[in-house]
């Protein structure tokens, strides 16, 4: 059994900061669960281009309000607390935060914890060995 406290992740290498977000990575590939779990804060007033070509992601919003737009078709989904969205087709998307948003993100395959978005919004596949 593994128990991870958010307070033990904050300020470590498992807390990764981007221009628009902070990702506290709670479970990683090394934990052997087959997925990774992140507690992520998206900053109010930002737009983030994301395209997980190598990962599927489910995102549960626990605080805040924003929207997700799929680039392929321009469809926009409002997102608020207590809603989940799943990027089940490696959807290229824009995440816009109207307020600070706190999200619980689950990735498959799991990330190693070293990843950050590249210029296309992609997390590369990283071997942590």
UniProtKB/Swiss-Prot annotation:
Signal peptide segment: none
Catalyzed reaction equations: (2S)-4-acetamido-2-aminobutanoate = L-ectoine + H2O
Family indicated by similarity: Belongs to the ectoine synthase family.
Biological function: Catalyzes the circularization of gamma-N-acetyl-alpha,gamma-diaminobutyric acid (ADABA) to ectoine (1,4,5,6-tetrahydro-2-methyl-4-pyrimidine carboxylic acid), which is an excellent osmoprotectant.
Keywords: Lyase
InterPro entries according to UniProt: Ectoine_synth, RmlC-like_jellyroll, RmlC_Cupin_sf
E.C. code: 4.2.1.108
Domain of life: Bacteria
Pathway involvement of the protein, from the record: Amine and polyamine biosynthesis; ectoine biosynthesis; L-ectoine from L-aspartate 4-semialdehyde: step 3/3
Pfam families (alphabetical): Ectoine_synth (PF06339)
Gene Ontology terms describing biological process: ectoine biosynthetic process
One of the record's GO molecular function terms: ectoine synthase activity
HAMAP family referenced in this protein's UniProt entry, alphabetically: Ectoine_synth
Name of the featured protein: L-ectoine synthase
């Amino acid at each position: 059994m593994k128990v991870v406290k958010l307070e033990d992740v904050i300020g470590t290498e498992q807390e990764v900061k981007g221009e628009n977000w902070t990702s506290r990575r709670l479970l990683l590939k090394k934990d052997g669960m087959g997925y990774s779990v992140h507690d992520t804060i998206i900053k109010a007033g930002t737009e983030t281009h994301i395209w997980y070509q190598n990962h599927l992601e489910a995102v549960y919003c626990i605080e805040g309000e924003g929207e997700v737009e799929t680039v392929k078709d321009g469809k926009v989904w409002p997102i608020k607390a207590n809603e989940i969205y799943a990027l089940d087709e490696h959807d290229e998307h824009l995440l816009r935060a109207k307020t600070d948003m706190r999200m619980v993100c689950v990735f498959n395959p799991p990330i190693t914890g070293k990843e950050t978005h590249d210029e296309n919004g992609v997390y590369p596949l990283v071997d942590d060995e």
